[in-house]
């Protein structure tokens, strides 16, 4: 009896020891618990935050270049309240830790290993939870869509959670218009000192910063606080169909009367407030003492912009123009049955499903084999049909549902006659994968077109190409403002809209209705200026009107992102929030150039004035793009 009791006690002690070891190991393998609700305590500019928007021209402590400085100098806060796409714009990681909003952090656990797979960070005035992935997942493609919160991965380095975020939308680093670009990377360090959470964030921006910008915020636990809802509803004060009345409030270069207000108020030299990196270092103090503050708060400053960021377009133009590379063609699923094929010239939209494939544009001829391979791969990734409720009519259900047929390309729709969008027409029509819509083998390449639609475009595109690029010319055309395909394709309507006098007189956009995807061609490019061609009927006003039509057709999911997805002619997958930014950029540059024309400036004088300088880091990095754009405007 005593022996049994001793054994029981020994077994209990052993079990307790094992559990203690397991518990200790679990604690050692677990990161610090950052979950909970946190409220703002302090940050570097805390004394300045209660007065609302930062004063114009106040950029102290920032490491911005002249391109960013010009963007901020011409910024008007009225832009945010005027644009429905900006009224509810959340703040991204480039600024959010400064924003005084309460923060809630939750865990997302792997259901099998029970380890933390991600943290969810939700901020009061944001579009939703920001996922910080801790499972070493790879970053998305360079062509993947951008968002306000970006794509974030995290890793614990001792007690510090280090977060790296990319794929960000263009945003801000201060509320008075200092921008952060869509190429920015943000690195954050979060570390716990109960009950405080220290949040250090570093912005690395090749477009708008001369060196990394490091800032910090301090938060404290608020165990009884919950985040309130944030039902931000944007207001469009324009009547339906009146987007031509929309204007972008902004200051013309050299006309902002508020750039000296802060320096005058603090009786400090203007150079201390203009955001030069060298002004952050102790040795600059002696230089600052030799400078004088402005004599009045409303002196209209005439800034001189002359650093390296002002010569982006010049350096691009000095490079020889070369054919686009097509070594890395890839497909991205967009929505529904629609994929984006990128890296083979202009972007291609492809509806892939049981009816076959409709392509919007065909890319570069040299990339045709890779484009066809990408379409074939995407088609084989489609989920096989579900097993029917009734008995199977097939001898082998698995083989019947997994035997993928060669996808048939039924039609190519060309958005314009630009070479990067049409030069693959002949090669793709001649491939074994091409089987025209509504036709059998008799209607393959070289036979009579009959009722077959093979390559489709606006009539102006066909007429122009028959005069110089006949081998790739469309076989079928439309003449009206809108054309709807005669039948549903892959279970959705396909509509084609003529956008007259935009980039050319024959531009089309293609709307896949059920998937809610619009392919714009070169009307919208997420990383270059539009290639407006006056000789072929293009114009800046027609281009802006075309973008307005795209915006009228699209909706956002929440807070100016998501919803209708936009496949641009070039660049990364976008949404209507991105298109709105692009449209506003064109309107600002148009206004600047028109002002110069009104002053009697010649084309060469306009070019020398660099009216696009602050946007060139975003859209002017390819040879000849900026010069041709300015000439067209």
Summary of predicted features, one role per range:
Residues 27-51, 321-355:
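Mature N-terminal segment immediately following signal peptide/propeptide cleavage
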